[in-house]
Amino acid sequence: WLGWLHIVEEELEKAADYAAFSDWVRAQGFTDAVVLGMGGSSLGPEVLSLTYGQREGFPKLQILDSTHPDQVRALEASIDLGKTLFIVASKSGSTLEPNVFRDYFLARAKAVLGDRAGDHFVAVTDPGSDMERAAQADNFKKIFYGVKQIGGRYSVLSAFGLVPAAAMGLDVKDLLERARIMVRSCGPAVPPHV
């Protein structure tokens, strides 16, 4: 569970992929990007959304992490399914809530978009998970992979936080470079101050 200690350098190697995804999101004209997840898979993106807000030209990032029918209905009423990107996030791929969210919103999107519904969905999951298989079967636009050695609550600097960050228009490379400064400032080579 200590994979987060080195994640910044690993994710910086993928900065161009996140930038390309961000450009694609912008070009699609999505008005909303909705993270469907629970716990650590949704907490990091929620903090990013609350901290940075909506960026011009990019979708508003929203989080659905409650199965309460009123919250699901309220979220659905606030979006245009034809202009929404869904980010289904589950490390294990077997967490009940994200799977229920995926099934519900995919069915709703198919009613509006038909066979193009998968183009409005991306998955963030660990390699080999049930979510990976479901995303492939449902023709999701893209699957991003997390790191099995990182627990959900430490995953904001992995794909679980960076995919939503890119979708909302944040410069992921800059975010990671700033995180690297802090990582290096707290590293084992830094002498303690007395």
Where are the regions a protein language model picked out?
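Glycine-rich phosphate-binding loops that contact phosphosugars or nucleotide phosphates
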Residues: 23-187
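Cofactor-/ligand-binding subdomain signature composed of acidic, glycine-rich
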Residues: 1-31
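C-terminal and late-domain segments of enzyme folds
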Residues: 191-194
